[in-house]
């Protein structure tokens, strides 16, 4: 089954995404500014009300470009730690240099926080498994937090070089429109990214995805996941529409 990730910019959008059938969301705030780091209360609320929902959390301290100061980098580190503590299943991050390359030192810093969390979770799980041998208690699998490099990728000056850097950093996927105005317009680049990735990292097409074009984008690129806000504007803000979510899922999965 092809997976749809729904970008949710507020708690009511989480409800709509789940109602429409979504199994994974990207949670952010202020979707009107292309998404900012959400309050930790939103993360906890989503996980408490929908325990089986996979919640990926955007880390973006401000609107504008993706070139961050030292103070902003410090804030992002804190936001990653807070999101992990709040129960995030995935962290969505990205940063660039003024020249339009991946900010490898900052990304290494943020990725190391997630990797340290995952290592600690593995150690805890190992201890539980040892205990299970004595108590006949068999715990479920430990939670591994995944990492997505977000659409800062679409501003990279050398996308194929950036692809290799992001793979080396250990990210699980790249959210991208193929450096075009929409994912549908960027299918040629998306297809080439998918080819070059060779299964080493997922390519997640996003931007302008609708029930009418989602299946075409997937067929043209060979990607196995897709990202959409599935949103409408109500009361001056973007909110997820359950019918649009259901429509995309129907289009990509029949």
List each model region and its residues:
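Active-site-adjacent beta->alpha loops and helix N-cap segments on the catalytic face
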Residues: 11-12, 31-53, 71, 97-117, ...
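Hydrophobic, well-structured mid-protein blocks that either form specific transmembrane helices
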Residues: 84-120, 138-162, 166
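Catalytic cores of alpha/beta
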Residues: 12-16, 67-79, 157-169, 193, ...
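C-terminal alpha-helical cap/extension of soluble enzyme domains
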Residues: 56, 60-63, 197-254
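Glycine-enriched alpha-helix->loop->beta-strand junction motifs that scaffold or abut catalytic
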Residues: 19-28, 50-53, 87-90, 144, ...
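Glycine-rich phosphate-binding active-site loops on the catalytic face of alpha/beta enzymes
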Residues: 26-36, 82, 86-98, 171-184, ...
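Glycine/small-residue-rich loop that forms an oxyanion/phosphate-binding "nest" at active or ligand-binding sites
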Residues: 46-107
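Hydrophobic faces of well-ordered beta-strands that scaffold small-molecule active sites
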Residues: 2-6, 25-27, 55-59, 91-93, ...
